[in-house]
Swiss-Prot record:
Regions of compositional bias (Polar residues) in chain numbering: 458-470
Database matches in PROSITE patterns: G_PROTEIN_RECEP_F1_1, G_PROTEIN_RECEP_F1_2
Locus of motif DRY motif: 172-174
Annotated protein name in UniProt: 5-hydroxytryptamine receptor 2A
Membrane-topology annotation of the record: Multi-pass membrane protein
Gene name in the database record: HTR2A
Phosphoserine sites (modified residues): S280
Biological process according to GO: chemical synaptic transmission; G protein-coupled receptor signaling pathway, coupled to cyclic nucleotide second messenger; glycolytic process; intracellular calcium ion homeostasis; phospholipase C-activating serotonin receptor signaling pathway; positive regulation of ERK1 and ERK2 cascade; positive regulation of fat cell differentiation; positive regulation of glycolytic process
């Protein structure tokens, strides 16, 4: 009898447990599945409880429901990052196509911009998608551990290449302003590519220690299951070598370039001593040369206090510096928060809130990635050649419809009878016209200056200066 009573008691307790479990299940379904409003209230109440008591979520919100809500929040972040990835890849592909196909854009500075676009495009292809994947997995590394060091290496490589390209552009423009003749003589396409190779070599050298040491010791690239640089020495040294030092060089040379342009503009306005003699004219038949080389003129300048550059060429340089300055500014503004926070994470480990630092780094790194997507937008807004090329490429028109060449001469030579095929005019000996100079500002491309936007680029080392004196 005692045994039967114990069995009945056990069965009744089991029945009561099942009934209580059923009631709890119904309560759970009512609280979290009855509507959007109840879910929000339960979640807000949980957050308030955590803030008031600083306790875990046990008893107030079940872990499956919390994970579902948290995953939904991260999906919105992943959606935003997907938009950034698409803009980065598509925009930089357009930049690469424009420099490759448009002769007007084929000069040293735009070659650097094309190489920069390649780095940004590879960042969008190889680095950003993996970063989005880690967001979906709660910043845990979901791929094989050996790929972590490779991913960080590519991230550092392309980010370093971006700042190195901007630094090289700033240095190249400054040299072109300070010594235009020397820069024009030694600034060929081959030398521009050699400079680009040097930039990539430096970037590879800075980022190479990551896979070398990371593949040997996982602790240098893993921290609590997350794939990130855990070596504090490399974080400090890498931040200064890969960002702050090139940033300092870039900013100094850019402001020196602006100062030099302002100084030359002042000299050109105050001193009309740019004495330019028209030595010879040459009109060649269109069948023998391309339209870009149809009209050539040799120009000889007399030495004066200011004879290197005219107001139009200085104005073109200032426009180019304006566009580059916007690119520099956006890059600095978008990457500085990440690198400053990265340094703070190492320096103030004990005094700073670790969770806050990690959250800021996760946000700031994507703000830095965003700089790779905005460069094509800057080119589109401020450069009509890029804007026209992008518009045609989107419409699958890869060649520009060339308009027939119309040659107009205004007040440059006296009216003479000449053949339509060829006219040559040279200076006469002991003629007063030999001493006649052009004091007006003539629109010309000075030695060492990049081609303006609406002038076709010439790959030859000979400088054919265009003149339009009105």
């Amino acid at each position: 009898m005692d045994i039967l009573c114990e069995e009945n008691t056990s069965l009744s307790s089991t029945t009561n447990s099942l009934m209580q479990l059923h009631a709890d299940t119904r309560l759970y379904s009512t609280d979290f599945n009855s509507g959007e409003g109840n879910t929000s209230n339960a979640f807000n109440w949980t957050v308030d409880s955590e803030n008031r008591t600083n306790l875990s979520c046990e008893g107030c919100l079940s872990p499956p429901c919390f994970s579902l809500l948290h995953l939904q929040e991260k999906n919105w972040s992943a959606l935003l990052t997907a938009v950034v990835i698409i803009l980065t890849i598509a925009g930089n592909i357009l930049v690469i196509m424009a420099v490759s196909l448009e002769k007007k854009l084929q000069n040293a500075t735009n070659y650097f911009l094309m190489s920069l676009a390649i780095a940004d495009m590879l960042l969008g292809f190889l680095v950003m998608p993996v970063s989005t994947l880690t967001i979906l997995y709660g910043y845990r590394w979901p791929l094989p551990s050996k790929l972590c060091a490779v991913w960080i290496y590519l991230d550092v490589l392309f980010s370093t290449a971006s700042i190195m390209h901007l630094c090289a552009i700033s240095l190249d423009r400054y040299v072109a302003i300070q010594n235009p003749i020397h820069h024009s003589r030694f600034n060929s396409r081959t030398k521009a590519f050699l400079k680009i190779i040097a930039v990539w070599t430096i970037s590879v050298g800075i980022s190479m220690p990551i896979p070398v040491f990371g593949l040997q010791d996982d602790s240098k690239v893993f921290k609590e299951g997350s794939c990130l640089l855990a070596d504090e020495n490399f974080v400090l040294i890498g931040s200064f070598v890969a960002f702050f030092i090139p940033l300092t060089i870039m900013v100094i040379t850019y402001f020196l370039t602006i100062k030099s342009l302002q100084k030359e503009a002042t000299l050109c306005v105050s001193d009309p001593g740019t004495r330019t003699k028209l030595a010879s004219f040459s009109f060649l038949p269109q069948s023998s040369l391309s339209s870009e080389k149809l009209f050539q003129r040799s120009i000889h300048r007399e030495p004066g206090s200011y004879g290197r550059r005219t107001m139009q060429s200085i104005s073109n340089e200032q426009k180019a510096c304006k566009v580059l300055g916007i690119v520099f500014f956006l890059f600095v503004v978008m990457w500085c928060p990440f690198f400053i926070t990265n340094i703070m994470a190492v320096i103030c480990k004990e005094s700073c809130n670790r969770d806050v630092i990690e959250a800021l780094l996760n946000v700031f790194v994507w703000i830095g990635y965003l700089s790779s997507a905005v460069n094509p937008l800057v080119y589109t807004l401020f450069n009509k050649t890029y804007r026209s090329a992008f518009s045609r490429y989107i419409q699958c028109q890869y060649k520009e419809n060339k308009k027939p060449l119309q040659l107009i001469l205004v007040n440059t030579i006296p009216a003479l009878a000449y053949k339509s095929s060829q006219l040559q005019m040279g200076p006469k000996k002991n003629s007063k016209k030999d001493d006649k100079t052009t004091d007006n500002d003539c629109t010309m491309v000075a030695l060492g200056k990049e081609h303006p936007e609406d002038a076709p680029a010439d790959s030859s080392n000979t400088v054919n200066e265009k003149v339009s004196c009105v």
